[in-house]
UniProtKB/Swiss-Prot annotation:
UniProt-listed GO biological process terms: microtubule-based movement; mitotic spindle assembly; spindle elongation
Domain Kinesin motor: 49-395
SMART domains listed in its UniProt record: KISc
Gene name per UniProt: KIN5A
Function (record text): Responsible for microtubule translocation. May be important for the organization of phragmoplast-specific arrays of microtubules. Plays an essential role in stabilizing the mitotic spindle. Required during mitotic cytokinesis.
Higher taxonomy: Eukaryota, Viridiplantae, Streptophyta, Embryophyta, Tracheophyta
Protein name (Swiss-Prot/TrEMBL): Kinesin-like protein KIN-5A
CDD domains hit by this protein: KISc_BimC_Eg5
Species per Swiss-Prot/TrEMBL record: Oryza sativa subsp. japonica (Rice)
Amino acid sequence: MDRRIGLTSPSPKSTEKSGRDLRSGGDANGGANTNSNSIPRGDKEKGVNVQVILRCRPMSDEETKSNTPVVISCNERRREVAATQIIANKQIDRTFAFDKVFGPASKQKDLFEQSISPIVNEVLEGYNCTIFAYGQTGTGKTYTMEGGGTRKTKNGELPTDAGVIPRAVRQIFDILEAQCAEYSMKVTFLELYNEEITDLLAPEEPKFPIVPEDKTKKPIALMEDGKGGVFVRGLEEEVVYSAGEIYKILDKGSAKRRTAETLLNKQSSRSHSIFSITIHIKELTHEGEEMIKIGKLNLVDLAGSENISRSGARDGRAREAGEINKSLLTLGRVINALVEHSGHVPYRDSKLTRLLRDSLGGKTKTCIIATISPSVYCLEETLSTLDYAHRAKNIKNKPEVNQRMMKSAVIKDLYSEIDRLKQEVFAAREKNGIYIPRERYLQEEAEKKAMTEKIERLGADLEARDKQLVELKELYDAEQLLSAELSEKLGKTQKDLEDTKNVLHDLEEKYNEAESTIKEKEYVIFNLLKSEKSLVDCAYNLRAELENAAADVSGLFSKIERKDKIEDGNRSLVQRFRSQLTNQLDTLHKTVSTSVMQQENHLKEMEDDMQSFVSSKDEAAQGLRESIQKLKLLHGSGITALDSLAGEIDMNSQSTFERLNSQVQSHTSSLEQCFGGIASEADNLLNELQCSLSKQEERLTQFAKKQREGHLRAVEASRSISKITAGFFSSLDVHASKLTSILEETQSVQDQQLLDLEKKFEECAANEEKQLLEKVAEMLASSHARKKKLVQTAVGNLRESAVNRTSHLQNEISTAQDFTSSVREKWGFYMEETEKNYIEDTTAVDSGRSCLAEVLVECKAKTTMGAQQWKNAEDSLFSLGKGNVESADSIVRTGTEANQSLRSKLSSAVSTTLEEIDIANKALLSSIDSSLKLDHDACANIGSIIKPCHEEISELKGGHYHRVVEITENAGKCLEEEYLVDEPSCSTPRRRQIDLPSMESIEQLRTPDYDELLKSFRESRASLKQANGDMKHFLEVQEATPPSITDPRAPLIARN
């Protein structure tokens, strides 16, 4: 069997030659032309740059022990490599930028996941991709591509040092198995050694070859297809079904690769190797047509360039190194020509560049892994590798997706291949055809010619052997005897042959029966396939529904993840807002506590001042009491003196009248007629005198009463002052206690509200977490509203309580101010009342003095009138009795003198009383003035104390207001601006009707019972026999059925 394969030729093509060519994507596909899914026209015209990855190996143990200087530094974050070079005692740093940079500490897994994994995914999308390692010998190319030498997995996992090839294989199988795709996979493994291509998967040759000069590994020809592509004729392909099989093939091929020990590498690869994986994946178009998607991955491990003088290569190793350097030099020239857009690119100068032609400037996606050494001893080779790799970045490929093939075209191609193989097998069985490769046939023809010449040379020896003919005749006689024996045996054998013919006839009958049974089985299989096709169609429909459902579930999960992320952000925001609110409330609490302490200090000072003021007022009140007591005593003594004087006047008047009465009675008899009129006048005069005396007594009594009332008013005024002062200070204490209680209530209410807010928030969060799994959509919609409403309510309550407490403080302050103003007004009113009482007392004293003067004047006038009357009576009665007149005159004179003395005593007593009253009033006024002065001083002190208290309370009010405003703004900012709300992305899947097949339709897909199928098949067979009369027509009808009946299984169904 002749197989030919190219590096980038995964698409099979039917051909008339004996063999199957796999050429680059874009060739004809056996008449099954389909639209190729290529990259956009803009990218196709512009091209895609070759991806270049740089990896620096770590220092070896020998380099570490010898303290070899490091001249390479890798910056993986900036994707740069810096090389330090000393020229003419001057340090020069050269920096190279690549697509990816991996330093000495990088892992195999990191390199694969970051750079190679996307390329493997593109292979599964239908692209041709090439990955090859390039660099100096001993820099880790083979380690990067294949790994540390062991591919045994632990618990299904690859070892940590597994390279690109095993990891790519594992990823391909994992993705295909996860997609439940139908696929087939083939691998090839070739080696390029000294410009000769060797198949590493070819079977081992015989130990004793026909031609002695034949080698163990036979070179294979490199052919061109005339369209710019190349392919390798006769390359062995292995069909693989698992990653383990590929690992075995890799181990098998790697064991055949040529390696040798040099001074730079203990196991240096002396050849280039190319491991290719071709994948055919079946997929369905939108019209339900089955297509084959083809992708190919080429994994190239290049031999490293080396300096012969430094590597120690001799003889054959030197020739190997020369061929390696020659091919790599050609690769460098190709890279330079592609970068410089040269008209001629020297692909044909080396087989390596011919094999990599499509990977460099062609239709393949290419990734170059450049490996370097950090040692100063390898600086020249390292700079060369960096220059070539940096130039290779500018190579532009134009990758295209391979054309998809129809399944029917692939099946047709496979049928033609099967027919060709059948013909070869038949020819081999009949031994009448050429069934070996053309090269082997030509080789055997040459061998036959050599043998003919040898026979001619031995013809001369035949005559010499004629002498042996006699001996041979004797042997012939012996053979005749043996022939007779054999004839007898032949008779027996013929008899056995007859028996065998009979058995063969029986076998033919059984064969016919078996053939009819096979036809029955084929009929049953046909019906089973028909049912299977219906089930497959139903399964495709269900798969489409499942994909839609999976997309919906993915959308729902993404929405849930987005909402969880927003909820986490909101939860952290609320926690941060809670801590900020707690800090601000602590600051506010400290401010209020400081203000309360200051208010307590001020109130304590005010209390001390008021205690001193009360003590001074007590002393002043005590002085007033003493002054009033003295005034009362003075007033009582004056009243007593007046009473005694009035009594003396009464007694004198009575004694005088008694004497006059006795004198008059003694003269009554004599003067009764004469003094009738005079007596009446005297009686009238005495009556008027008594009336005036009684009026004077009443006026004195009223004056004393007014004095008592004035003093009582002064005492009541002092008592009212004391009561007002005491009430003022008690009200101040009440207001201070109210302020303290309001502040404490404010603090307690705020703490309680914060605790309630925290409890409500925790309860709300707990309830949401419990209900989140049951009502995700509803809870996410209502969570924000409830939390916002809860926090707004709490903040509103805080605002209202702060406003209420502020208004309470303002009311208390205004109440204290009003009370202070009312105290001032009462104090002024008391001063006015005191002055008014003083003026009334002074007026009363003056009026009493004037009344007493008038009474005295009236008494004097009346006394004068009485004297005149008595003189007139004396003159008129002189004639009546001179002696009586003298006695009466003496009596009257005595009475007048007594009255005058009494009047003088009364005047002196009144003046003395008035003077004492004036003195007492002045003392009382001086004490009142001193008390007023003390009261004014106390009011000034209270005002000086109240003013800073008022200022501090105003500052506390402003600070409290600003703090509350700040808390409100922070809360509003946190809950209105920073609090995230899940905005609809319009990507949530809508409710739709899922088309589920009914149980009846599913039951209709079931294949009928085996007995019923046989019964129907036999009835149709009997009807055909009756119509045609033989079985031949029936067989022709059966052979005319579609090929799917005789060959029911699709050749590309995965059997893993």
